[in-house]
């Protein structure tokens, strides 16, 4: 893969081959698709405990009945334009309390750009106190699915968390991602999920600018950029979606299935604060799903993740509440991704009697929806 990238870069620099803009874009898309295919077959974890399984399209299941509650932080979602060609404000809103920021942007121009998230106290004479309670970020690979997966690994891994806090005086600003922004080379992605708390209203701005731009001045003067053809930005209430199965799972004769991040389930609805227009989070990116269930009986139950929308690469957490255990799970662990074939699925665990929670979130650059399946073991 690295050889292919080096050859491609060499062609651009030497000029021995004339490449039209449309051909170049098509090549990039083909290269990305090739990298996804390769990634779904590359080993990345030794001694994996998961087991690949195959779920045919005509697989017969029973719909799991679950109670649903949405609560938790307000979500700021910035993913359109996904590939950024012009400097400007990509998303902006004023928020307070518990907030989750999900951003996903690619530098689409030749040369480096700076991606930044600015926090500004615009209204409060008293200082605004803020805290970063959890975060995960990744980027800089041509394989965007790997970036999405690594970002989630960091977000869900308790040991990688480094809580931060600070304050903003009246009119004061601070850059959130690194203190100076993130320098993005051409065609590179940066994706992040950040949980925050503000004790007073704060203006949050996601922006792209020149590498040497003064961030505070740019944040004041820059124009808000329009979305691309995919309407994926906005502000959404209650970004934690909780499901609790109504009945214990007891070696079911017919497998139980719960489908998530699907149009039938419905997506989070909110407002694009830059325009005031209604917004819908197609895919529920940035939403944290928690599925609570009880396993009963003497026989273990097979717990399966089945991505049915295409290649999928993420992380999640399996909690055994009976034993007080929390396990970080690569989804999948043997390869970067799975789901390049519709029958591909993974058995995450064989679960004995007890109370469990499975926590996950739709990863950036992955395909949806997914199914959770509980079936009896052989």
Describe each model-derived feature in a short phrase.
Residues 33-42:
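Bacterial N-terminal signal peptides
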Residues 105-111, 118-127, 196-198, 295-297, ...:
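Asparagine-centered strand-capping/turn motif at beta-strand->loop junctions
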Residues 108-116, 188-192, 285-291, 354:
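Short, solvent-exposed loop/turn segments enriched in Ser/Thr/Gly
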Residues 126-147, 303-313:
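Short acidic, flexible loop segments centered on an aromatic residue
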Residues 51-54, 295-378:
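C-terminal functional regions that serve as terminal interaction/effector modules
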Residues 183-219, 368-376:
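Terminal connector regions
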Residues 51-92, 229-266:
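A eukaryote-biased signal for short, well-structured alpha-helical docking elements
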Residues 148-185, 328-353:
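Intrinsically disordered, low-complexity Pro/Gly/Ser/Thr-rich segments with frequent PxxP/GP/PP motifs
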């Amino acid at each position: 893969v690295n050889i292919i990238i080096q050859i491609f870069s060499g062609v651009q620099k030497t000029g021995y081959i004339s490449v039209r803009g449309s051909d170049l874009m098509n090549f990039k898309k083909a290269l990305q698709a090739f990298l996804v295919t390769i990634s779904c077959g590359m080993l990345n974890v030794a001694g994996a405990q998961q087991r690949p399984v195959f779920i045919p399209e005509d697989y017969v299941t029973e719909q799991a009945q679950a109670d649903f509650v949405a609560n938790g932080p307000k979500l700021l979602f910035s993913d359109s334009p996904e590939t950024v060609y012009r400097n400007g404000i990509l998303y902006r809103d004023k928020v307070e309390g518990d907030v989750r920021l999900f951003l996903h942007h690619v530098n689409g121009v030749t040369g480096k750009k700076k991606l930044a998230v600015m926090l500004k106290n615009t209204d409060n004479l008293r200082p605004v106190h803020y805290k970063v309670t959890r975060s995960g970020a990744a980027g800089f690979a041509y394989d965007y699915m790997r970036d999405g997966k690594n970002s989630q690994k960091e977000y869900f891994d308790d040991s990688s968390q480094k809580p931060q806090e600070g304050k903003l005086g009246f009119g004061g600003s601070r850059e959130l991602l690194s203190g100076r922004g993130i320098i993005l080379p051409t065609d590179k992605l940066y994706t992040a999920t950040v949980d925050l708390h503000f004790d007073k209203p704060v203006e949050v701005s996601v922006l792209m600018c020149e590498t040497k731009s003064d961030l505070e001045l740019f944040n004041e003067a820059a124009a808000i950029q329009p979305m691309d053809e995919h309407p994926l930005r906005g502000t959404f209430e209650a970004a934690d979606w909780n499901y609790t199965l109504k009945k214990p799972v007891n070696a079911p004769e017919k497998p139980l299935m719960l489908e998530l991040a699907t149009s039938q389930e419905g997506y989070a609805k909110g407002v694009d604060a830059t325009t005031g227009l209604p917004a819908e989070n197609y895919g529920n990116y940035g939403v944290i799903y928690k599925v609570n269930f009880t396993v009963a009986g003497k026989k273990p139950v097979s717990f399966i993740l089945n991505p049915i929308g295409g290649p999928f690469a993420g992380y999640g957490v399996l909690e055994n509440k009976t034993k007080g255990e929390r396990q970080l799970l690569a989804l999948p662990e043997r390869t970067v991704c799975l789901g390049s074939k519709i029958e591909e699925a993974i058995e995450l665990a064989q679960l004995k009697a007890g109370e469990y929670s499975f926590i996950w979130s739709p990863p950036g650059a992955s395909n949806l929806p997914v199914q959770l399946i509980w079936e009896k073991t052989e």
